[in-house]
Amino acid sequence: MILATKVFFTSFVFGFILFPYFIKLLKKISKDGQPIRSCGPESHLITKKNVPPMGGIIILISSLLPILLWAQLTPEILLLILITLFFALLGFIDDYLKLKTNHYRGLSAKTKILIQFIVALVGVFILKLYSAECFTKTSLFKGVIIDFGYLYVPFAAFVIVGSSNAVNLTDGLDGLAATQVITSFAFLGLIAYITQADMNITLFCIAFIGAILSFLWFNTHPAKIFMGDVGSLSVGAALGLTSVLIKREMLFAIIGIIFVIETLSVIIQISYFKYTKFKYGEGKRVFLMAPIHHHFEKKRWSENVIVMKFWIISIICSVFTITFLL
């Protein structure tokens, strides 16, 4: 408990001190801030103008520092750190290209996903080398174990990449991604502690909770900084890999239900648009806008209302998971 407290306050205080200076630095470097989509909600062109991205850099520094100081650098923790940093690098390049071109499109989606899958597959293969014979087995819920066999490696890679991009899609409103990530890390860390999977994984989760809470202080509406792709892609990958390490990938889908809903809304929107355009010559939409948080914005829900209601849903689903499915 003392160690967990040290990790939490080290990450939170470090981030809380660094963010104001980092925000000032980013505003000097990029006066226009993160490029905003003109086709998005009209309010974003005003409320999110000149807000700098790349807050994920401080999240990573603040979270990894106490991990290096207080946690044991087991193979699992080292793999978590490496995968997180690889995805952070990819996100940084994407953010940099957006700022350089002053356009909301950075790296192409195909390029990002290809690189993500390569990194994730390598990471899972490394994990397989030093894991026990039960490596391919995962827990669905109470007493139900599934053995994926040879399919486990691509499945685990899919979880990591899917989680990374799901957090990225969710990061569209002030505080939305941060609140969802905090909930996911809290309950995955709790599962790791309850099942005694690895106390160091619990400390890893606590470190990120502290760092993201310090970020949330400056990211609540109206946000002073965004986490950017450097933050969302890396934090999402860390969540996905954490669920893989504690063998609770299926439960993570319920704990991170908002991430799943956000991703499905985009898939449904794009698929239905392409289908109707092919069949009728004109594309139609299921939602007013996707991801689904923008749909509710179009229905004139305020950002704070959407964020809080989504947070309530994720907490309820997480408590249900711990109570009835673990």
From Swiss-Prot:
GO CC terms, sorted: plasma membrane
Q: Which Pfam families match?
A: Glycos_transf_4
List the InterPro entries. Answer: Glycosyl_transferase_4 (IPR000715), PNAcMuramoyl-5peptid_Trfase (IPR003524), PNAcMuramoyl-5peptid_Trfase_CS (IPR018480)
Query: Per its UniProt record, what CDD domains does this chain match?
Result: GT_MraY
What are the protein's UniProt keywords?
Answer: Cell cycle, Cell division, Cell membrane, Cell shape, Cell wall biogenesis/degradation, Magnesium, Membrane, Metal-binding, Peptidoglycan synthesis, Transferase, Transmembrane, Transmembrane helix
Show the stretches that span the lipid bilayer. 2-22, 51-71, 73-93, 113-133, 143-163, 175-195, 199-219, 225-245, 250-270, 305-325
Q: What is its EC number?
A: 2.7.8.13
| Pathway participation | Cell wall biogenesis; peptidoglycan biosynthesis
What this protein needs as a cofactor is: Mg(2+)
Membrane topology per the entry is: Multi-pass membrane protein
**Compartments it resides in:** Cell membrane
Q: Which reaction does it catalyse?
A: UDP-N-acetyl-alpha-D-muramoyl-L-alanyl-gamma-D-glutamyl-meso-2,6-diaminopimeloyl-D-alanyl-D-alanine + di-trans,octa-cis-undecaprenyl phosphate = di-trans,octa-cis-undecaprenyl diphospho-N-acetyl-alpha-D-muramoyl-L-alanyl-D-glutamyl-meso-2,6-diaminopimeloyl-D-alanyl-D-alanine + UMP
Q: What NCBIfam families does this protein map onto?
A: mraY
The protein's job, in short, is: Catalyzes the initial step of the lipid cycle reactions in the biosynthesis of the cell wall peptidoglycan: transfers peptidoglycan precursor phospho-MurNAc-pentapeptide from UDP-MurNAc-pentapeptide onto the lipid carrier undecaprenyl phosphate, yielding undecaprenyl-pyrophosphoryl-MurNAc-pentapeptide, known as lipid I.
Family per similarity comment = Belongs to the glycosyltransferase 4 family. MraY subfamily.
The molecule here is called Phospho-N-acetylmuramoyl-pentapeptide-transferase
Q: Which organism is it from?
A: Wolbachia pipientis wMel
